Amino acid sequence: MNDLIKDLGSEVRANVLAEALPWLQHFRDKIVVVKYGGNAMVDDDLKAAFAADMVFLRTVGAKPVVVHGGGPQISEMLNRVGLQGEFKGGFRVTTPEVMDIVRMVLFGQVGRDLVGLINSHGPYAVGTSGEDAGLFTAQKRMVNIDGVPTDIGLVGDIINVDASSLMDIIEAGRIPVVSTIAPGEDGQIYNINADTAAGALAAAIGAERLLVLTNVEGLYTDWPDKSSLVSKIKATELEAILPGLDSGMIPKMESCLNAVRGGVSAAHVIDGRIAHSVLLELLTMGGIGTMVLPDVFDRENYPEGTVFRKDDKDGEL
């Protein structure tokens, strides 16, 4: 947080901290699931800022849970070992050989690196995966390409979440860092899209919020038209435009939609290229990204006059 306000005057600093108070009160003892991805995973300064954000949330009483993918790192390792990477319908084609790399990179590299960064602040983070204690159960996913169901290998969808062991980690005051690989009932291990996994997990554990880090400012309804950026959208509105979105954004917005329809109070798509973007979205009036709301949103738990988004008037949504 110091990085956010170090260049501000004393009065402005005080106002920034005071502005965060209702949000700090609201998120105390609440679970916040954060999907870690994009530039925040590859830029050293952004990685450090993200880790600090998770510790900040934990220190003020929230219960952060991190779900991560590892696309750039997987692609780099595939190139190093001479394996061809291929995508179909926005998903990585995952042969058994590619799956070995995915498994190694997600849990053995990306997850361990993030656990280490968080634990540089104290003994907070615990690495785990969808394989551990039956957290996720998956089934094979077929991708629709030009109307044709297409086999993309060991890519799965989550069909069950057993979060009992994960809740033990959370209730012990730790920060779970979840790698998105999962066993299927057929005995295979599947590569799970991290956006999809984060949304499913958030709904299953009764999270208050889901945040998805991206490399853009939020949801553009007509990418790349910058004027089409929206600061908030309700579930039915999102569902209507989902098929026409940019292919890279569809899994992220689908995850948000499923989360809010699964009981999560709101989901957020935020720009992971901004240091401390998680804190800026959760703890400042108006936020910085796009907020996805259920069709009926209960404001009674928030102080009167709370401004959720920058273009709200009198706190209305």
UniProtKB/Swiss-Prot annotation:
It is found in: Cytoplasm. It is an enzyme of class 2 (transferase). GO terms for biological process: arginine biosynthetic process via ornithine; L-arginine biosynthetic process. It comes from the Bacteria. The record marks 35, 252 as: Transition state stabilizer. One of its GO terms (molecular function) is acetylglutamate kinase activity. Its EC number is 2.7.2.8. Substrate binds at residues 70-71, 92, 191. Its main location: cytoplasm. Keywords: Amino-acid biosynthesis, Arginine biosynthesis, ATP-binding, Cytoplasm, Kinase, Nucleotide-binding, Transferase. GO terms for cellular component: cytoplasm. Pathway: Amino-acid biosynthesis; L-arginine biosynthesis; N(2)-acetyl-L-ornithine from L-glutamate: step 2/4. Belongs to the acetylglutamate kinase family. ArgB subfamily. This is Acetylglutamate kinase. The lineage of its organism: Bacteria, Bacillati, Actinomycetota, Actinomycetes, Mycobacteriales.
